[in-house]
Amino acid sequence: MEIKVTYHNDKVKRLERIKQGDWIDLAAAKDYYIKRGDFALIDFGITIKVRKDYETWVVPRSSTFKKYGLIQTNGIGIIDSSYCGENDIIKMPVYATRDCYVKQGE
């Protein structure tokens, strides 16, 4: 299946499959310092266009909570084929259970 990816920043990490498995890791497009109890939208700096009748999922890795103390507030983000416009940048809504620093590219 062909997926069209638009990168909105030259510093955004390019998408690639993980070494073992079928998933693709997303990475923060900029640095974030999130205080305990705060909500943030982690911007991945990309737009993805998939074929009609397909969807993309944004889900946390098992290490996301362990490493950062972040919980994805919507559980699973579903991006359907219509969310592919110029301003439809993929983001992950998170809640911080402790102060954390997410570096660009992580």
State what each model feature region is:
Residues 1-106:
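DUTPase catalytic domain/fold
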